[in-house]
């Protein structure tokens, strides 16, 4: 592969074919491309605008080079992040509820733009985020839940970490995380940081062999189901792509004040989640339930979103016991108990 020719193509705003993008991504991730050229390619892709074929090619390369585990019929709730509002880690909380009814392979990382990433909040709850593949399979078998830390399961990504940090801008790698689950999760609720990216990412997801993935962008600009207004979504299945607009009132609830969902740290997020599980924070509980409702719809466990909300309302009653089971199997229960005490006031 001639990297300089690829760069010229991108500078001329020509899209790469899937196989070109895949081979390019493999070369970059393996560390075979000089950093100065990696920087140029990532910036050229961003300036041109990443195409569907490029996202699919890069995603396939990342999947191939990842440490893989087999979790049949798993669901993931990973989103792109990057909304900048710093809301509570609702996708992680939803993953805990979902593990009551389905295997969950939660792919995630530390915070990039927010105050708390999924890895950060799980650590705050006492979870051991470094889980080797054999242990991961054991945890899924016993608890229906495992966290797959992106930095651990995509070790070759260290070869581009310095370039990404130095550039300090969003690159194609920022939007690949949710599409590169090491367990090859066939079901997903995927938050998207920009409404403009819904169409592109849904078309990319359609090429990546999901059974069903629902991509969401919520008002006022979050990569979650909206707590205050409309959620714009793309439902991607083997049958094609369906566009849906959902309002928070469609769940049968009133809008949730966004300021009640903001967190200052991973511990703050952990406390809010546990308070919701204890029945002491109605606003966060509602936020968790509406996101869980859409994930349940992705799993075809419910016929519509209102039914999903009612199911989630039932599941949240068992959520603290489930969280305790998850931490007991792979973490520090004393740390969780400390969070529970702080949440009980």
Swiss-Prot record:
Record-linked SUPFAM superfamilies: Nucleoside phosphorylase/phosphoribosyltransferase catalytic domain (SSF52418), Nucleoside phosphorylase/phosphoribosyltransferase N-terminal domain (SSF47648)
Required cofactor names: Mg(2+)
Annotated metabolic or biological route of this protein: Amino-acid biosynthesis; L-tryptophan biosynthesis; L-tryptophan from chorismate: step 2/5
Gene3D superfamilies listed in its UniProt record: Nucleoside phosphorylase/phosphoribosyltransferase catalytic domain (3.40.1030.10), Transferase, Pyrimidine Nucleoside Phosphorylase, Chain C (1.20.970.10)
Keyword Secreted: no
Result after altering residue 107 to A: Limited effect on either affinity for anthranilate and catalytic efficiency. 300-fold decrease of the affinity for anthranilate, whereas catalytic efficiency remains nearly unchanged
Binding site for Mg(2+) 2: 223-224
Top-level lineage group: Archaea
Reactions listed under catalytic activity: N-(5-phospho-beta-D-ribosyl)anthranilate + diphosphate = 5-phospho-alpha-D-ribose 1-diphosphate + anthranilate
Chain residues that bind anthranilate 2: 164
Residues that bind anthranilate 1: 79, 109
Gene Ontology molecular-function annotations: anthranilate phosphoribosyltransferase activity; magnesium ion binding
Coiled-coil annotated residue ranges, if any: none
EC number: 2.4.2.18
Comment on bound cofactor: Binds 2 magnesium ions per monomer.
Signal peptide positions (record): none
Entry GO terms, CC: cytosol
Enzyme class, first EC level, given as a word: transferase
Record-listed 5-phospho-alpha-D-ribose 1-diphosphate binding positions: 77-79, 82-83, 87, 89-92, 106-114, 118
Function field: Catalyzes the transfer of the phosphoribosyl group of 5-phosphorylribose-1-pyrophosphate (PRPP) to anthranilate to yield N-(5'-phosphoribosyl)-anthranilate (PRA).
Family membership: Belongs to the anthranilate phosphoribosyltransferase family.
Quaternary structure and partners: Homodimer.
Name used for this protein in its record: Anthranilate phosphoribosyltransferase
Lineage: Archaea, Thermoproteota, Thermoprotei, Sulfolobales, Sulfolobaceae
Gene behind this protein: trpD
